[in-house]
Amino acid sequence: MTNTDNMSPNFLRNAFRRLTITAIAPIVMTFEPFFIFPVVLITLARRGFVYILLPITAALILRATKVNYGPLTVSPTMHFNTPSIAVFAVLLVATTIASVFKPKLWRAFLVAIVVISILHAATPIESPVKGEGCNKISIELLDSETNFCFYISSAKTGKMWYYHATLHFMDSEGLVVNRVHLLTAALTFSSEVVEFRNEQGKFHAIFYSEVPIDSLKLKLCYFPETVIGSLPVVFCSSVDLEVR
């Protein structure tokens, strides 16, 4: 391609179209509670109907409580850490450069931006709990050590023992895996299985036993949150506990 070709009206028009799509894609993909399916976005881009996205974006801005440009803007419905923002920012810069000079590479980068935006938009928020009065339970996944607060109380009612167990997120350390999000939790004792119920991020289990319980097995199933958002891959871990 010659310098004359680089400055041709057709080249400039196509470059401007790709730049516009690059800027709009993360915004459209991360509005809450609105969502445009990736196939629709990519189809519009391939057909060159980029200006159709402008009124859609304007309408969403009027209805949304806050504009979320991928992980570059934090809103109450999403949370991001420094590695996530750095990865997204580098990818966004690379996509912007590729939109002018490398159209084929630009398409791949654009898809990556859309995927990251969706994963972050789908990442749940859990309020961490202080460690006071907690029995810390740790699980390890790749480079992450995630700690949960576990507490169990008991009382004797007639001939039965009453137990109330609570479980919720404390803190996490890791670069690739930032934390994990619980899906299910269950306690096993004397061949009995008790499922926790999830109440806004805090897990509770109430059960009875004819004899005092001195040991439990806790099974946790969760999915990891990485620098590109939560991954829909389920992992499970088991922890042996003593009841004092």
From Swiss-Prot:
Keyword Transmembrane helix assigned: yes
GO CC annotation terms, alphabetical: plasma membrane
Places the protein is found: Cell membrane
Keyword Transmembrane: yes
UniProt membrane topology term: Multi-pass membrane protein
Protein name per UniProt: Uncharacterized protein AF_0399
Chief location category: membrane
Keywords for this protein: Cell membrane, Membrane, Transmembrane, Transmembrane helix
Taxonomic lineage: Archaea, Methanobacteriati, Methanobacteriota, Archaeoglobi, Archaeoglobales
Record field: transmembrane: 20-42, 49-67, 82-101, 108-125
